[in-house]
């Protein structure tokens, strides 16, 4: 069994311009303070204030955005991290685990991973993701690249269509098509941090947001030992070399996860399950009395002293005693949040410690709050009530359908750039305006300079004479469009769609 020594995991070096030499405890903490500054001041964090949590295009400031949600996750992550360190200290294990001088970085990595955990999410959340993946799947037919005869390949892009006698190129074409049809917020977060924003964070800090270990182009069954860790795509083909280096620097096996990412995940689970219900009451989807009844009914069999009684019933009873001086609604959610956090955060911390050998080597194939305990049951209760009574509400569904249409429509609008030949697009990139391509020139001008530069740099590392050059160029061109549209806020995407569709 691998010896647990967090000095081998909390790697304070960076991909570029990394600090050199032996560092003191204070110097290492300053390196992670630099990470905090880079993250908090990044435009990706600022954009979270206009991205959806549950309710798109919400004007009520009391309803959560991705930013306010992420701040709450950050606080819960800090609580769990401190609880882990406190319990290890009580057991006299901080020094044995190499943490005696790394408690500050441990907490900071968790906090900043929590703050960043949603930065890759597109406008309109999961419906934005679905719109991107459906749009590309309807053109690239990724499944056709796996086992159909070449003659039956339905891919509409000539460059990516399988060709007889080109086995090596066909393998790349298949990988590219699968990769582009598996857009995922977590994978986009890795791309943002490394490729688009070039934040040059420490290896440990990036490890904290690598939630899933499955490559986006992976096909076939996943190893049973890593089925949970590979539940979703975690990174793209464009970041493959970077992730390979990250694994080496953090001493992670293939498909393994960085230990502190489990805390980030638990903090997110605890935060959003109560927050979604509170936002639904704020939106008047149901009253607090109706919510209590939904929770009571969904719990099933009740017993004195069970977790429902200690958390939900306790919050309900207390909220009814102060109605003269406080809003019962506010009181209920205050007690519900406090009760939930005070039960689930210590439990998550203990699960982290109890499974530390597997967590440390990155192979623990579960979430911390995913077991057959009452704590997991409470979390599932909140999630199930939200699914049943919030996410399927007509107002929510209508906004999600609108969001799906907006993202699909924007991809349609920018698709002429993907229809250009390699020679035409290269000319457009070099000249920025081509008289014979008036529409495409104007669309290209609208793309963010940051995303255009990322495309130009990626293509500059390719060899134009190589047989695979057209495939890679088209891949990075698609990434350019996905980067631009997924980087929009909900409001910007909505306005852009209406303008370009000449709705106003």
Curated annotation (Swiss-Prot):
It catalyses: dGTP + H2O = 2'-deoxyguanosine + triphosphate + H(+). It comes from the Bacteria. Pfam families: HD. PROSITE patterns: HD (PS51831). GO terms for biological process: dGTP catabolic process. GO terms for molecular function: dGTPase activity; magnesium ion binding. Its EC number is 3.1.5.1. Keywords: Hydrolase, Magnesium. It is an enzyme of class 3 (hydrolase). Its cofactor is Mg(2+). InterPro entries: dGTP_triP_hydro_central_sf, dGTPase, dGTPase-like, dNTPase_1, HD/PDEase_dom, HD_domain. Residues 66-273 form the HD domain. HAMAP family: dGTPase_type1 (MF_00030). PANTHER family: DEOXYGUANOSINETRIPHOSPHATE TRIPHOSPHOHYDROLASE, DEOXYNUCLEOSIDE TRIPHOSPHATE TRIPHOSPHOHYDROLASE. dGTPase preferentially hydrolyzes dGTP over the other canonical NTPs. Homotetramer. Belongs to the dGTPase family. Type 1 subfamily. This is Deoxyguanosinetriphosphate triphosphohydrolase. It comes from Cronobacter sakazakii (strain ATCC BAA-894). The lineage of its organism: Bacteria, Pseudomonadati, Pseudomonadota, Gammaproteobacteria, Enterobacterales.
């Amino acid at each position: 069994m691998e010896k647990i020594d967090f000095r081998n995991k909390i790697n304070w070096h960076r991909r570029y311009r990394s600090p050199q030499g032996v560092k003191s405890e204070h110097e290492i903490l300053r390196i992670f303070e630099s990470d905090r500054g880079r993250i908090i001041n990044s435009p990706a964090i600022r954009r979270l204030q206009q991205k959806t949590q549950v309710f798109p295009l919400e004007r009520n400031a009391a309803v959560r955005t991705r930013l306010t949600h992420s701040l709450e996750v950050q606080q819960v992550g800090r609580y769990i991290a401190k609880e882990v360190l406190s319990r290890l200290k009580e057991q006299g294990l901080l020094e044995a685990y190499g943490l005696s001088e790394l408690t500050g970085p441990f907490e900071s990595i968790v906090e900043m991973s929590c703050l960043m955990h949603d930065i890759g999410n597109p406008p309109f959340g999961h419906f934005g993701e679905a719109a991107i993946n459906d749009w590309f799947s309807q053109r690239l037919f990724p499944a056709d690249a796996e086992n159909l005869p070449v003659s039956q390949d339905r891919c509409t892009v000539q460059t990516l269509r399988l060709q007889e006698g080109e086995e090596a190129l066909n393998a790349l074409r298949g990988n590219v098509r699968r990769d582009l049809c598996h857009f995922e917020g977590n994978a986009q977060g890795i791309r943002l941090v490394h490729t688009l924003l070039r934040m040059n964070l420490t290896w440990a800090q990036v490890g904290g947001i690598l939630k899933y270990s499955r490559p986006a182009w992976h096909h076939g069954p996943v190893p049973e030992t890593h089925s949970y860790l590979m539940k979703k795509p975690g990174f793209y083909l464009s970041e493959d070399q970077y992730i390979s280096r990250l694994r080496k620097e953090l001493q992670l096996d293939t498909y393994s996860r960085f230990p502190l990412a489990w805390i980030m995940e638990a903090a997110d689970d605890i935060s959003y399950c109560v927050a979604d219900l509170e936002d639904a009451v704020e939106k008047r989807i149901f009253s607090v009395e109706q919510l209590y009844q939904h929770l009571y009914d969904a719990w099933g069999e009740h017993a004195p002293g069970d977790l429902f009684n200690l958390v939900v019933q306790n919050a309900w009873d207390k909220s009814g005693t102060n109605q003269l001086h406080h809003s019962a609604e506010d009181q209920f959610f205050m007690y519900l949040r406090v009760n939930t956090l005070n039960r689930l955060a210590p439990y998550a911390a203990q699960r982290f410690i109890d499974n530390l050998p597997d967590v440390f080597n990155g192979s623990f194939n579960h979430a911390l709050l995913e077991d057959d305990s009452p704590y997991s049951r409470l979390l599932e209760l909140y999630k199930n009530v939200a699914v049943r009574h919030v996410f399927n509400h007509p107002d929510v569904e209508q906004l999600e359908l609108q969001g799906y249409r907006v993202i699909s429509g924007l991809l349609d609008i920018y698709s002429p750039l993907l229809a250009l030949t390699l020679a035409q697009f290269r000319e457009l990139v070099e000249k920025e305006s081509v008289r014979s391509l008036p529409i495409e020139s104007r669309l290209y001008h609208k793309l963010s300079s940051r995303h255009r530069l990322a495309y130009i740099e990626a293509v500059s590392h390719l060899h134009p004479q190589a047989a695979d050059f057209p495939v890679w160029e088209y891949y990075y061109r698609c990434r350019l469009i996905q980067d631009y549209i997924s980087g929009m806020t909900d409001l910007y995407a909505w306005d852009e769609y209406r303008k370009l569709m000449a709705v106003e």
